[in-house]
Amino acid sequence: LDTDLEKICGDIDSAREAGADIVVCYLHWGSEYQREPDENQIYMAQTLADRGADIIFASHPHVLQKTDILTSEDGRNVPVFYSMGNFISNQRTETLPSIANKRYTEQGMIAVVDLSVMKSTGEIIEKTMRVIPTWVDRYGSPTKYAIVPLDADMNSNAALNASGHLSRAQEALQDVTALLGEDCLKGINMPGISADAEKSEKKAA
């Protein structure tokens, strides 16, 4: 773990030295089918945020995990997507009979982060993070797969109409909303630096 973490931190340093305005990390970590990040994921995320990462995306557990906003040592707000689930996969209720969390393997997300940058300084002044939840549908012969956005148009989705799986998609949306919260689906705005860091800067000035 420490060897991998040291290498990633070195990559962050190299990116900054090369003039990168924004550093994005994408991690392959965590335990399969676990819906909560483990202590290693949490430790690594905070370490990378402190080292200079601006956004952290991740996958591998094959199920969704929570999102978070970390505060780095220098006061930046750093969005973390601990696991983005399965975007497209054959892992599902029908194919994983022995896995307790099998239905959650059908769920995924499109993670969206919008950045507002001060052109004169390159400083990130605002970030918005949100999630578009998705569900993998499988139906037909020959087998067809469809990525279904779990949104207001779900009831009229062509794939769900063909498969008859609307109720499963609706259940998936309930699962995702309970895990991530409605605010994350709508969008969370945050300043580039945390409110506490901003107060400290003003006091120092």
Which ranges hold each PLM region?
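Acidic, metal/ion-coordinating pockets
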Residues: 1-205
